[in-house]
């Protein structure tokens, strides 16, 4: 019986959240299905967006007898008190028994039991750790700026606080006041940041909906708001202590000379904070620069086929009307014939398109090679093709011939291998004419290698191609394997190609849905989604750090200029020109900048090694990135110094001296 459970999203989208849909019949692929339930909004499969849940053996009723086909993954919930090690031991015993009962298909199989979280996060864990670290560095820079601001504020209020201390205000009261002011600034900044994050997360999800696992579940909610409030409060207290202690120190009650000497010491403290800001910004800028360099390199990597003007459409034939190879092959032949009859259009089919990440692999045996123990056989990725696939995709032929219409179910089983297959398994021999078969077949079917084609980046532009064999669809298809990818090359990438594909499909089967249609250029771009996400997000953090560091050095230099107004006025009255004043003030700032950049370079040299797994074709210590970032940061920081220096050079010496 065909029963289906609706996902929450499609229930809301297509049926408006109507609870009466339960028990009713809907048409899926032209066949009636009974709705028996609706999933809650909180449920989602770890790696996929799913709208409909159906019984496995209804969707694939003939898959069970083919024991050599292993394409399913299981999810277990451990009983209370059962450890992962115990579960692995139990599962190993089950697989050993399966191998004894079915040696031709299951002998040598080893289960891999991993925590679901590890399976979901996978290689994203390092990216997440780096992004969290980047957030922490930006927070530290912001906190240093807050401390700098408060120390400048305390220095400006020196007279007021000295009088209050002289009149009996306790140290605790003065420290409390400064801490309250810091907390107010931090909480207001945190509130503004939360509002910006609510907007930023929406923009991020619209641009990168699937860059990381479960990214769609990220949002600015009450828990995030509470964390933001507590983090703002904690940082205000932590980084408000130094200004508060300065405000309550005994030197505030001193004479003017002592106050000025204290101001000099405070200036040194603020300078140290600025140096730390520049160093932290340097680390973030280097990290962002490396990821941008990686992205630039990946975009120049040839995928192994020509993407321009090629459209890909996913076609999944419903089991209710296409339950055997004959009906499936008839549909595919008619579709290819209809499309290839259109002027300037060429079409073909393949089991999985390049860069999709989807692939089927088989353990295999090469004829004439020494026997290999069951379970130790090498594996190879298999791709079933139909039509003139290699010419549609313009994948170069290196040796032998391509697959053609003469390769039928009744003829010799043949295959075309890629160059990676030749390099790994036939490094010193001619692969043409050699035969291979799948391991664990009840009735072995030998595949003769008739051609060699160029490598195609199937698993990503950063991933090297693995050994693969292309076989004719009619020779490799199974009754249960009803999905395929249609690839169509049109005249000059015609914008109407997608509508043409839909029209041709509807002409053969009006009820058949097409899940997705994408240009291959888009497929290539989508394969870089995670790299673009990492690079752009870290660049945003680095730009924020650069801005904060420049604000910090601007504030320190502005405070320095204000403190030295009398000195500058005297020097200008004695003949010092504006240019000399600017040079000397900028030189003071350059000392801080050089020290910060030096410390930042040393820190980045060590920390960027943690990013090695995210880098492709770029060394963690890439000299061009380090030098370029150092020059960028130096230029921005010098500009932040020049503005207050320029203002100082324009003061009227007589006005300053009269004020003093």
Task: Please report, for each region that a protein language model flagged, where it lies by residue.
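Small-residue-rich transmembrane alpha-helices
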Residues: 147, 183-252, 290-293, 588-647
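Alpha-helical transmembrane segments of integral membrane proteins
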Residues: 116-121, 149-176, 180, 200-322, ...
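Hydrophobic alpha-helical transmembrane segments of multi-pass inner-membrane transport and secretion
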Residues: 124-159, 234, 238, 268-294, ...
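Interfacial "coupling" helices/loops that link adjacent transmembrane helices in transporter permeases
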Residues: 142-186, 264, 551-593, 597, ...
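C-terminal transmembrane helical bundles of large multi-pass transporters
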Residues: 462, 500, 504, 508-601, ...
